[in-house]
Regions:
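Catalytic-core regions built around general acid/base machinery
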Residues: 102-105, 125-139
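Structural motif
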Residues: 29, 108-112, 143, 194
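Positively charged n-region of N-terminal signal peptides that target proteins for export
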Residues: 1-4
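Glycine/threonine-rich flexible loop motifs
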Residues: 116-126
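Bacterial N-terminal signal peptides
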Residues: 6-16
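Catalytic nucleophile loop
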Residues: 112-113, 136-156
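ATP/NTP phosphate-donor binding region
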Residues: 44, 53-102
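C-terminal and late-domain segments of enzyme folds
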Residues: 20-51, 66-78, 156-158, 162-286
């Protein structure tokens, strides 16, 4: 019966192949909240090593994209970035082949916080999206905070659930099929990214997805904290708080008649600044 339920998860929830990307770029994935200056300075320095070092900001996730973009431009310039541009695009603009030229000379791209679905409504499957993937393959640094962290993975948490809870009672159960996902940018295909993780108590939704997609790691990044994913598929934790990793690869998963998820044997890691993790072996690096 347990094997039948495992097959059910694969068929019903579209398990994604965890093939390694082989990209030469870096991911700088921030869990939201305040951004420590030393952490962000590292992003600026990394972006300066590729192309002509220009940083492109895409703030379309924000409800106030112009103001958000201007703020990020000022932040990066204050940290030493020489060339920073913010572009607020519509879906129509992103569908234009000319949109990809906005990324000429880019060494780093930064995706703002806000609503990740709003960002993806503009970018998904456009010439600009394809160019972003090409640049990542070539060595560019892709960074984002909060919603901009969520868009990094191929399977993206939207922040919604299928049941209709009362306000203040969101994500209170581990229930099969409850967590809504959609397609992200796909820079990382071996894990699902969640953000504001410990601060906003988001364990329930990520554990649910790990149960449903057991070949994908669940990586929950807290505020003021980031992971830097290198081309060798390892990541380092930087910042002031924690990163939680759930590994359900060898877990025993089942679902009750009332659709509650049971997950036995899941591995959990709680990582802090300086810790490193191998996405291939699913183990910490000592």
């Amino acid at each position: 019966m347990k094997r039948i339920w495992a097959l059910f998860f694969v068929l019903a929830y579209g398990l994604v192949s965890p093939a390694l990307s082989g990209a030469r770029g870096y991911l700088f994935i921030i869990g939201g909240g305040d951004r420590p200056e030393n952490m962000m300075r590292r992003f600026v320095e990394m972006a300066g090593r590729f192309g002509n070092g220009k940083i492109i900001v895409f703030p379309m996730a924000s409800s106030e994209p112009e103001e958000t973009g201007e703020g990020l431009v000022s932040e990066f310039k204050a940290l030493g970035a020489r060339r920073v541009e913010s572009h607020v695009l519509t879906r129509e603009q992103a569908l234009s082949e000319e949109s990809a030229r906005l990324l000429d000379d880019a060494g780093g791209v930064f995706f703002s916080g806000g609503d990740q679905s709003r960002q993806m409504a503009v970018l998904l499957h456009t010439p600009l999206h394809r160019r972003l993937l090409e640049l990542y393959d070539q060595g560019c640094v892709m960074a984002g905070t909060s919603a901009g962290a969520a868009v990094m993975s191929e399977v993206m948490i939207t922040g919604e659930e299928r049941r209709q809870p009362e306000e203040g009672h969101e994500f209170e159960v581990l229930e099969a099929g409850n967590i809504v996902t959609s397609e992200g940018l796909g820079f990382i295909r071996t894990a699902i990214i969640d953000q504001h993780f410990v601060t906003r108590k988001r364990h329930n939704r990520l554990i649910s997805l790990v149960a449903e997609k057991p070949l994908l790691l669940g990586i929950g990044i807290d505020e003021e904290t980031a992971i830097i994913v290198s081309p060798d598929e390892t990541f380092e934790v930087v910042g002031g708080k924690s990163v939680v990793v759930y590994d359900g690869t060898r877990a025993d998963t089942s679902v009750t008649p009332s659709r509650l998820i049971a997950l036995r044997g899941v591995v959990m890691h709680v990582l802090v600044a300086g810790d490193r993790f191998d996405l291939k072996t699913k183990k910490t690096i000592r």
